[in-house]
């Protein structure tokens, strides 16, 4: 936690919106993407710069708030949900306090910012090695797949080999999934372009299901710009993932269980626990209830989005109460929802802590 300073984080945060908005606006003006024909999504879409700004800000704000909300519970509930009678604190000043005393909690965000900064310096065609060197030499702490990839890069194993399971035992972990937000926020309404960005950057630290998690999250963010229907965003984004993959099958199960148990997220959690709670890759989780695998944790993101029904608190709370990586999961869910709804629609209760660090 002491390897990234608050000053560095705040400096990077100030450049974020400028870069993201400029990139997104440029992509909109120079790229046209043909989506799979569907009755669910518009074939053309127009968005004002004001609305674009509101959605981009919403994505980053939602992610930051979600991390802070779930932070106190992170990996304290392993293969166990957080029961309703257990309070989850969102104390006054908590985000500022985390910024000062536990900035490593925000690895979801400062990894995104590193990649954004590379785009700013080198443009949208920046080579993959530039992203790899940027985070490998950055002065902040890393864990699991990110840490293993850093070690690989510093020892001459460059991407995509740095993220491959032969060189990285954490290849299926959640790492790129929690830092892929930028890919969707920079490609509004263009999930295929978001996936292209993820193909380049996501393989620095992940492969297989770990990579699919980031592709899926990025696609949901991208589609959040052109659809206000959470069910459509969740289902259409899944088309970016191979149907025969374990990741796709799990997310599809969650969607089906939501239809079967529309008012009972805990039943869906139990079904998911029985069928999908195996972490066979991460050395820390193989023989323990600890599970940092991208599959189960992304299932918790989807559960929050579907059962949250557009309510900011409910969405975060469900993703958090599913347990395991319970700060990253509400961060993803809240970020996607706030991209759909916009920064201006985040309830004041959640904004007051964020404003202290804006």
Language-model segments: residues:
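Mature N-terminal segment immediately following signal peptide/propeptide cleavage
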Residues: 47-70
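Active-site cavity-forming subdomains of large catalytic enzyme subunits
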Residues: 53, 61, 111, 116-215, ...
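Beta-strand segments within the central parallel beta-sheet cores of soluble alpha/beta enzyme folds
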Residues: 128-136, 195-200, 232-239, 315-320, ...
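Active-site-surrounding "flap" and adjacent substrate/cofactor-binding loops of secreted or lumenal enzymes
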Residues: 72-103, 109-112, 129-135, 139-143
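Helix-termini ("caps") and immediately adjacent flexible loops/tails
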Residues: 38-53, 85, 97-98, 106-108, ...
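Catalytic phosphate/nucleotide-handling subdomain of diverse soluble enzymes
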Residues: 65, 69-71, 76-89, 205-209, ...
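Bacterial Sec-dependent N-terminal signal peptides
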Residues: 1-40
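Accessory "access/gating" subregions that flank catalytic or transport cores
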Residues: 47, 153, 162-171, 182-190, ...
């Amino acid at each position: 936690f002491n390897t990234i300073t608050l000053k560095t984080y705040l400096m990077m945060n100030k450049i974020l919106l400028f870069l993201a908005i400029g990139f997104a606006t440029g992509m909109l003006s120079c790229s046209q993407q043909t989506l799979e024909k569907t009755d669910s999504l518009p074939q053309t879409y127009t968005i004002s710069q004001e609305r674009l700004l509101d959605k981009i800000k919403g994505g980053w704000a939602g992610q930051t708030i979600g991390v802070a909300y779930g932070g106190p519970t992170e990996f304290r509930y392993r293969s166990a949900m957080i029961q309703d009678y257990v309070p989850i604190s969102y104390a006054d000043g908590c985000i500022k306090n985390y910024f000062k005393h536990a900035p490593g909690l925000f690895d979801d965000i400062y990894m995104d910012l590193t990649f954004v900064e590379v785009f700013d310096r080198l443009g949208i065609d920046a080579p993959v090695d530039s992203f790899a060197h940027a985070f490998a030499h950055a002065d902040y702490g890393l864990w699991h797949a990110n840490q293993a990839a850093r070690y690989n890069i510093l020892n001459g194993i460059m991407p995509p080999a740095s993220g491959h399971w032969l060189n990285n035992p954490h290849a299926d972990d959640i790492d790129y999934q929690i830092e892929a937000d930028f890919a969707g926020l920079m490609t509004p309404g263009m999930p295929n372009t978001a996936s292209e960005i993820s193909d380049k950057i996501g393989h620095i630290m992940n492969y297989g299901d770990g990579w699919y998690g980031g592709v899926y999250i990025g696609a949901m963010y991208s589609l959040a710009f052109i659809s206000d229907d959470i069910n459509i965003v969740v289902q259409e984004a899944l088309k970016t993932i191979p149907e025969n993959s374990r990741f796709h099958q799990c997310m599809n199960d969650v969607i089906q269980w939501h239809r079967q148990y529309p008012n009972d997220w805990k039943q869906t959690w139990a079904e998911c626990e029985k069928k999908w709670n195996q972490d066979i890759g991460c050395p820390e989780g193989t023989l323990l209830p600890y599970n940092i695998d991208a599959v189960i944790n992304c299932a918790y993101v989807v559960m929050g989005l579907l059962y949250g029904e557009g309510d900011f608190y409910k969405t975060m709370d469900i993703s958090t109460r599913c347990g395991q990586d319970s700060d990253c999961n509400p961060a993803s869910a809240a970020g996607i929802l706030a991209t759909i709804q916009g920064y201006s629609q985040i309830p004041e209760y959640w904004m007051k802590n964020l404003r202290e660090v804006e």
